[in-house]
Amino acid sequence: MSKENLLLTGSKGFIGKNVIKKLDSLNNFKITKIEKNFYESNDWQNEIDTLIRETNLILHIGADSNTMNKDVQDVMYHNYHLSKFIFDKAKKYNKNIVFSSSAACNGINGYPSNLYGWSKYAAEQYGISNNEKFIALRYFNVYGPGEEHKGIMSSVAYQAYKKKTFRLFPNNPKRDFIFIDDVVNATIFPIFNNIESGIYEVGTGKEESFERVLNLMNINYEYHDESVIPEGYQFKTKADKNNFMKDWQPKVSLEEGIEMYIDYLKANK
């Protein structure tokens, strides 16, 4: 049986690498991988036109995920303009597309509170408005194996494990922490299920404190002064289960995820 052609951007990123690993294990797909340096080619626009024309499905995972990047032109180019180009080509050739968005789109009171959030929000809104076969997945706080290269953008679990101590913001901020395996399964879920075009949330539907994560890891912590809290900082994020894809549910609890992650980190020192 011939394999389906699948185009995946962000092939060297945290989520992209894990998605590829999962798809390779299924052995149903011929995956064309695009990484960031692809766009440095003088002819990348024609090349991607050809790739999209010849593929069956697009997983657009690649992005500038650095929420600390304040360069408007750089962030909007990578997260909006490149996405818009891909979405337009997907529409031209009538291709299904799954777009990796972010809970940063929810921001505060339903609107993004930082540049990264606005760039992803603009991209998903353009995609859903112009493509009939478009699914955006708003990932919440993803952690797990494969995020080692992310540096300051890696999860609190990874950073705390490496430092053996951690400084937290005061006032009890909470996040919806979701294990990478659940995110991978959500990302490929539309491939195997008839999911309507739309914007969906990928989290657990539970908010957990950073203190709880560190306590599960037996990591010591202290607190920053309130004066260092960034403007627009989100103190709570939690996915709305009503916004999950039909029949998709996360399977890994925080306790299970942290245990598996620590085992992985110990084995890969």
Describe the residue ranges of each PLM region.
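C-terminal substrate-binding subdomain of Rossmann-fold SDR/epimerase-dehydratase oxidoreductases
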Residues: 162-269
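NAD(P)H-binding glycine-rich loop region in Rossmannoid oxidoreductase-like domains
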Residues: 42-78, 104-107
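N-terminal Rossmann NAD(P)H-binding glycine-rich loop of SDR-like oxidoreductase domains
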Residues: 6-24
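Conserved Rossmann-fold NAD(P)-dependent oxidoreductase catalytic core, especially the SDR/UDP-sugar
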Residues: 60, 84-116, 135
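Rossmann-fold scaffold of SDR-type NAD(P)-dependent oxidoreductases
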Residues: 9, 55-61, 99, 201
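NAD(P)-dependent short-chain dehydrogenase/reductase
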Residues: 115-117, 121, 125-175, 180-184, ...
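Active-site segment of SDR-like NAD(P)-dependent oxidoreductases
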Residues: 12, 64-66, 102-107, 113, ...
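Glycine-rich NAD(P)-binding loop of the Rossmann-fold in SDR/ketoreductase-type enzymes
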Residues: 73-85, 114, 118-119
